[in-house]
Amino acid sequence: MNISDIRAGLRTLVENEETTFKQIALESGLSTGTISSFINDKYNGDNERVSQMLQRWLEKYHAVAELPEPPRFVETQTVKQIWTSMRFASLTESIAVVCGNPGVGKTEAAREYRRTNNNVWMITITPSCASVLECLTELAFELGMNDAPRRKGPLSRALRRRLEGTQGLVIIDEADHLGAEVLEELRLLQESTRIGLVLMGNHRVYSNMTGGNRTVEFARLFSRIAKRTAINKTKKADVKAIADAWQINGEKELELLQQIAQKPGALRILNHSLRLAAMTAHGKGERVNEDYLRQAFRELDLDVDISTLLRN
């Protein structure tokens, strides 16, 4: 591909609104000014270097475009269950807990809820942002408060002013990383601003506040929980909905997908496997079938015991 072809290819994509200079810059490592100048043949720097970088970007772009398009989002029975808890917390200005095993679709459901509703904010807690200051800072950034104070007191007051009157919903993903002090801070923020709050994560989110592990601090928060949703495993209806979205309806394929979805990682493993199987089948001009699914399980070297499935 020569420089003229690269310029023409990029110009076509931008003019057809398939991408933007900003997106190309972000993904290629070049500045928007450099890309614009290069496309218009006005770049005074090393055109050869820039052309090589943009050729690599173009090749990757077209390779991705040729892949079979996965379903953007599948509204499963579990998704509806999670959304019900989120709507309840929002409408009643209360706290809800959504807990469950990894890979059952909690995070994707929350992201879609945020995308399709106004005044919904979501942050994901990591060990490095599990303190009061770091957690509140994450929330401030999510709220667009890029110049928020960097001290706990002023930051908490700024967040209260920002959230008051919004009738919004704050979703805290991976909330099992949070200790009593941070949860108490979030509880007070929720109460004072009358927003909804959803704490989401593994079962430790809830078990910390109940049973033998319950401390005085956790017990105070527990008494404020209005709704708890526990998702222990993937429902058969969820797998069927995902299979339908991928246009997979053979009995053997459905049975295999159902068995895999019961393993640790559930829908996450299922989606990775479906994408790889779809890529392989697409390259051969065929539809996804049982053989492609089994091959995908093998190639992904999944950390699940599927040996009995593959022998059947």
From Swiss-Prot:
GO terms for cellular component: host cell cytoplasm. One of its GO terms (molecular function) is ATP binding. Residues 21-40, 223-312 bind DNA. It catalyses: ATP + H2O = ADP + phosphate + H(+). Its EC number is 3.6.1.-. The record marks 202 as: Sensor-1. CDD domains: Death (cd01670). Its main location: host cell. The record marks 224 as: R-finger. The record marks 268 as: Sensor-2. Its cofactor is Mg(2+). Induction: Expressed in the early phase of the viral replicative cycle. Expression of early genes is repressed by viral Repc (latency) and favored by viral Ner protein. One of its GO terms (biological process) is DNA integration. The record marks 151-152 as: Involved in DNA binding. ATP binds at residues 100-107. Keywords: ATP-binding, DNA integration, DNA replication, DNA-binding, Early protein, Host cytoplasm, Hydrolase, Magnesium, Metal-binding, Nucleotide-binding, Transposition, Viral DNA replication. The N-terminus region contains a putative DNA-binding region that allows filament-filament interactions and probably favors MuB polymerization and filament clustering. The central region contains the ATPase module. The C-terminus comprises four helices arranged in a loosely packed bundle which can bind to dsDNA. Belongs to the AAA ATPase family. Selects the target DNA sites for transposition. Recruits DDE-recombinase A to the target sites and catalytically activates it. Displays non-specific DNA-binding properties. Polymerizes as helical filaments around the DNA. Coating of the DNA by the target DNA activator B might play a role in favoring target-primed replication over integration. Prevents self-integration into an integrated copy of the viral genome. Homomultimer. Polymerizes in presence of ATP, preferentially on DNA. ATP hydrolysis triggers polymers dissassembly. Interacts with DDE-recombinase A; this interaction stimulates the catalytic activity of the latter as well as the ATPase activity of MuB followed by its dissociation from DNA. This is ATP-dependent target DNA activator B. The gene is B.
